[in-house]
UniProtKB/Swiss-Prot annotation:
It comes from Archaeoglobus fulgidus (strain ATCC 49558 / DSM 4304 / JCM 9628 / NBRC 100126 / VC-16). Residues 4-76 form the Sm domain. Keywords: Ribonucleoprotein. It comes from the Archaea. SUPFAM superfamilies: Sm-like ribonucleoproteins (SSF50182). One of its GO terms (cellular component) is ribonucleoprotein complex. The keyword Phosphoprotein does not apply. SMART domains: Sm. This is Putative snRNP Sm-like protein. Belongs to the snRNP Sm proteins family. The keyword Ribonucleoprotein applies.
Length: 77
């Protein structure tokens, strides 16, 4: 049985992740929390374009219905 999305998020808590949003925006940060709607809280977040940091945003809440995918960040655990 494949892992459920919320189980994967739970294993990623306190780890660096990359989140891609509808419209192509990407954020990299430490996953601090989530809920059943896949709303995400990232700490020390940065907005990324073409692999480069565009700006540091610090703490950010991302609305779950805008999330395309969540992936472990390179160099993360």
């Amino acid at each position: 049985m494949p892992p459920r999305p919320l189980d994967v998020l739970n294993r990623s808590l306190k780890s660096p992740v990359i989140v891609r949003l509808k419209g192509g925006r990407e954020f990299r940060g430490t996953l601090d929390g989530y809920d059943i709607h896949m709303n995400l809280v990232l700490l020390d977040a940065e907005e990324i374009q073409n692999g480069e940091v565009v700006r540091k945003v610090g703490s950010v809440v991302i609305r779950g219905d805008t999330v395309v995918f969540v992936s472990p960040a390179p160099g993360g655990e």
